């Protein structure tokens, strides 16, 4: 009975998910024979996860009807829905509604895409000799580990499904429209994006979980203390407008809002990030979500638990006044020329196809005397129009009418003697338990628009 309990629970969760999306209730993976007995604590954990899959109350309360909170939110929601209309602009793969449907497709198909990878792992395991397999099963129970992974994929899939449903309500997408988009894409032989949905779950760790605190603490204190210093230059009742482009899942913007005295606008182009953000922003209490973001890869784990361990989020309630403006940073804020007191670019400027366009937009959106704070690497992507060294960036930015100001030693050591740019090591890896580390020597500066 013990040996079959996990499979029974997985079957229940799978049936629930299948009924929700109209697919077969049977798991796509074949169940292995002779599953080792589960320990009682593993059974308890699996039951809890299965309950989480089927209990909407454990996934956070959603605001009724997604009513915008403030006049600022209502105004932006109206503009967003106009941009999202199929008749707004040309219907191409870059249309925001098309990109949204692609993201919804991927979140809806999380289970199928990850179960296919698990099937591949199970097939590969069959290539091990009988003697080797016996050793593996007697010592570590490799098949049981794969079965545990399956159960946790279903937990993640339930959250991804809920994310998609939340987004469909927010953006007003009918199920038929999404079904038609998915059917056409799959008829054309395309597959839903597996990587982007997995990255969203990992970004939840970085932005909204206790486990992301180390990475946040390498950048956020520098930025937040600089903002407080700038705020001290103004009257106490002055509210400064702050823009954070490339905001991802938005935590930095919410921490800025929590300082008080700032009107915070965040901006993001990726619909995968925006769907994830809308879901997190809908949470009204802490630790409403439990998921397993590291079950999608076997590498760099010291223990099995490091791969399977749960993450709880959010570790703080999102600030209700933060406003997300979706779209291309260079164009979506065209009506905000000279509007912002401060622009904060955190791990952002090197994402530009045209770095000079980013610089132009920052200059255009800032008020005279406004500040631009940068914290991040210079890791250029594929096909950028221009790639500048730090020294070249300094010269170009000064030529555009910015003056560098010292941001202070909390933001690292001076990169160049005599130049007011600092360097600070910053990890970007999501998993503090992993046997690998990815870190940048982030470049930090503050400039004033003259």
Predicted regions and their residues:
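Conserved class I S-adenosyl-L-methionine
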Residues: 235-248, 255, 263-268
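Conserved Class I S-adenosyl-L-methionine
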Residues: 291-296, 379, 383-415, 422
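N-terminal accessory segments
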Residues: 2-236, 240
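A short acidic, Gly/Pro-enriched loop at the edge of an enzyme's catalytic core
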Residues: 330-343, 437-439
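S-adenosyl-L-methionine
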Residues: 281-336
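Conserved beta-strand signature within the Rossmann-like core of class I S-adenosyl-L-methionine
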Residues: 369-381
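Core SAM-dependent methyltransferase catalytic element
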Residues: 400-401, 416-450
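A short glycine-rich, Lys/Arg-flanked "PGG" loop and its adjoining helix->strand segment in the class I
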Residues: 356-369
